[in-house]
Amino acid sequence: MAGQFRSYVWDPLLILSQIVLMQTVYYGSLGLWLALVDGLVHSSPSLDQVFDAEILGFSTPPGRLSTMSFVLNALTCALGLLYFIRRGKQCLDFTVTVHFFHLLGCWLYSSRFPSALTWWLVQAVCIALMAVIGEYLCMRSELKEIPLNSAPKSSV
């Protein structure tokens, strides 16, 4: 297997560190988007915006703004997949893992399983956006030409 290009090696420490890094990117960028939106509409920031499934929705202005923040966060996390994961084949895995841990966080925070249909819809859209755009960016990066220098090293 020495001749295989970019062969996959099982490295649990690398995978765990990438999971932690992507969770950090997810919550860090979501916090920035929510802070930006809250600053624009002069609203007070709250952890409920991140972890309460009842806040996301389309019928109220705060719900629409939170939904918009989650969608923008999916686009930001797609860039995180490009810079930190770098493998198109792993984008869906890391995207689902990030959102699974977010589901657990929401469940623990509110002490009930998220049952709002809009929360599930927003999460499904965000998973699709993050995975597809992240995979597109990673595959575009993987398919770049490898520059080869064909000039001789010396003319001796």
From Swiss-Prot:
GO terms for biological process: Golgi to endosome transport; Golgi to plasma membrane protein transport; protein localization to Golgi apparatus. Keywords: Golgi apparatus, Membrane, Protein transport, Transmembrane, Transmembrane helix, Transport. It holds the Pfam family SYS1. InterPro entries: Integral_membrane_SYS1 (IPR016973), Integral_membrane_SYS1-rel (IPR019185). It is found in: Golgi apparatus membrane. The chain crosses the membrane at residues 13-33, 65-85, 91-111, 113-133. Its main location: Golgi. One of its GO terms (cellular component) is Golgi membrane. Belongs to the SYS1 family. Involved in protein trafficking. May serve as a receptor for ARFRP1. Interacts with ARFRP1. This is Protein SYS1 homolog. It comes from Bos taurus.
